[in-house]
């Protein structure tokens, strides 16, 4: 194997290695817990029953509605998609050309070796046919729960929530991340809400370790499955 081929293979392997999505990293600042912007004042022992800043509405249901409050999102995601396409292109062509006379004189002569008369004629025919059939299907399901914090309260009362959960297993780490918008009316009395009620949801389920590496195809498999493969 010459040096040029070795360099080419190394270049292809490096390029395909760069196409792999980098593994998720823990402690992403975007998903970090958001603390309340206005912390409660320190309690003053002045002998009074009621302290300023510690008031509580008697009819408050304790549902999350402020920055830093905690909400548990129940994951109930299920998607199923399928696609099928068929194509058939066919083209036939035939051309025939013959000369029987030239300036009023016949162009047909006797064949000196037998087998009929000779004439100036030509005939061409062609046929092309292309067929294609493709089918793709995908089904995903994600169930569980994740507890997040309220990062921002929009002017219309919508809550912007986000958070992550890491689980360390024997063979690696499992990650669940979610971010989106939640209506305060959709939050139950126990501060739970279904993921189907989260608007503009960004849900990530990934991991690192042996299981995550085993589910990734090798660099040669990625080359055969990439658009660079000419066949």
Curated annotation (Swiss-Prot):
GO molecular function: cytoskeletal motor activity
Membrane topology: Lipid-anchor
Lipidation (S-diacylglycerol cysteine): 19
Function: Assembles around the rod to form the L-ring and probably protects the motor/basal body from shearing forces during rotation.
Protein name: Flagellar L-ring protein
Subunit note: The basal body constitutes a major portion of the flagellar organelle and consists of four rings (L,P,S, and M) mounted on a central rod.
Species of origin: Pseudomonas aeruginosa (strain UCBPP-PA14)
Region (Disordered): 118-141
Family according to the record: Belongs to the FlgH family.
